């Protein structure tokens, strides 16, 4: 059975989040959280929060054992971008896109329904 957690509108670019996700994909939840705890990335904190939420959803909503959970699917989708203006020389302006990310984690205990 699977349980899912989504964190939306995280103010970090998806391209910065995806390499951190690759480190924990397919690993047991406890091991994934241990890996993320010692990474110096902002993305690691946000991913850890989402994994903990998925684990809580699995144990509270679906009565799954928290020790048996693995990170089956984890991916980052692009959210809306905040558009800002940066003044440039000669009266011009450049657009700055502050990107956001939607983080999705699906944990599985390996049992079929």
UniProtKB/Swiss-Prot annotation:
**What is a GO molecular function of this protein?**
rRNA binding
Q: Name one GO biological process term.
A: translation
Record CDD domains: Ribosomal_L22
Q: Which UniProt keywords apply?
A: Ribonucleoprotein, Ribosomal protein, RNA-binding, rRNA-binding
Q: Give the source's domain of life in one word.
A: Bacteria
Return the GO cellular component terms, semicolon-separated: cytosolic large ribosomal subunit
Instruction: List the cysteine pairs that form cystine.
Output: none
Under the heading InterPro entries, the entry gives: Ribosomal_uL22 (IPR001063), Ribosomal_uL22_bac/chlpt-type (IPR005727), Ribosomal_uL22_bac/org-type (IPR047867), Ribosomal_uL22_CS (IPR018260), Ribosomal_uL22_sf (IPR036394)
Looking up HAMAP family in the UniProt record yields: Ribosomal_uL22_B
How it assembles, according to the record, is:
Part of the 50S ribosomal subunit.
The job of this chain, per UniProt, is described as: This protein binds specifically to 23S rRNA; its binding is stimulated by other ribosomal proteins, e.g. L4, L17, and L20. It is important during the early stages of 50S assembly. It makes multiple contacts with different domains of the 23S rRNA in the assembled 50S subunit and ribosome.
**Family, similarity comment:** Belongs to the universal ribosomal protein uL22 family.
Q: What is this protein called?
A: Large ribosomal subunit protein uL22
Organism for this UniProt entry: Roseiflexus sp. (strain RS-1)
């Amino acid at each position: 059975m699977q349980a899912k957690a989504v964190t939306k509108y995280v103010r970090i670019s998806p391209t910065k989040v995806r390499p951190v996700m690759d480190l924990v994909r397919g690993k047991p939840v406890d091991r994934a959280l241990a890996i993320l705890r010692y990474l110096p990335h902002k993305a690691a904190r946000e991913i850890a929060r989402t994994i903990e939420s998925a684990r809580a959803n699995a144990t509270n909503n679906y009565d799954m054992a928290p020790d048996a959970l693995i990170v089956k699917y984890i991916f980052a989708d692009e959210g809306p971008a905040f558009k800002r203006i940066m003044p440039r020389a000669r009266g011009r302006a450049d657009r700055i896109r502050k990107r956001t990310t939607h983080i999705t984690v699906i944990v599985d205990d390996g049992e079929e329904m």
